[in-house]
């Protein structure tokens, strides 16, 4: 259940990034609108530019965090909420057990054949 919580949290973070990108576009549009006026209001331009810059920095920071997380997941490194590594180790152990059983059965047959020979 914790895995779903983390996944939902990641999705909420991506939705917030999407809203922030919409704010960036809105700020850029407002700045362009202000620049298109005959006498642009410098204070308004500064405010729009500051909001634009702050939003871009937040998006960059959040996306970097998301990319770091995805890099960890994609490379198979252990990360919170993942059981991939443990499942892989368990599967490999079961495969080794099966292989050992096959080899022991072959060895047993060989021993029996050797004992049956006069």
Curated annotation (Swiss-Prot):
Pfam families from the UniProt entry: Med11 (PF10280)
GO molecular function, a single term: transcription coregulator activity
Single GO BP term: regulation of transcription by RNA polymerase II
Gene3D superfamilies recorded: 1.10.287.3490
Keyword Nucleus among record annotations: yes
InterPro entries: Mediator_Med11 (IPR019404)
Alphabetical UniProt keywords: Activator, Nucleus, Transcription, Transcription regulation
GO-annotated cellular components: mediator complex
Annotated localization: Nucleus
Keyword Cell inner membrane recorded: no
Main location class: nucleus
PANTHER family for the chain: MEDIATOR OF RNA POLYMERASE II TRANSCRIPTION SUBUNIT 11 (PTHR22890)
Family, similarity comment: Belongs to the Mediator complex subunit 11 family.
General function of this protein: Component of the Mediator complex, a coactivator involved in the regulated transcription of nearly all RNA polymerase II-dependent genes. Mediator functions as a bridge to convey information from gene-specific regulatory proteins to the basal RNA polymerase II transcription machinery. Mediator is recruited to promoters by direct interactions with regulatory proteins and serves as a scaffold for the assembly of a functional pre-initiation complex with RNA polymerase II and the general transcription factors.
Complex formation: Component of the Mediator complex.
Protein name (record): Mediator of RNA polymerase II transcription subunit 11
The encoding gene: med11
């Amino acid at each position: 259940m914790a895995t779903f919580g983390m996944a939902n949290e990641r999705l909420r973070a991506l939705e917030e990034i999407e809203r922030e990108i919409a704010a960036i576009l809105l700020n850029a549009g407002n700045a362009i609108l202000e620049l298109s006026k005959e006498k642009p209001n410098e204070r308004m331009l500064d405010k729009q530019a500051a909001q634009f810059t702050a939003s871009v920095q937040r998006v960059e920071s959040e996306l970097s965090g998301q990319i770091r997380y995805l890099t960890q997941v994609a490379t198979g490194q252990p990360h919170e909420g993942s059981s991939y590594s443990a499942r892989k180790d368990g599967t490999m152990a079961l495969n080794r057990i099966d292989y050992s059983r096959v080899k022991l059965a072959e060895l047993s047959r060989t021993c029996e054949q050797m004992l049956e020979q006069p």
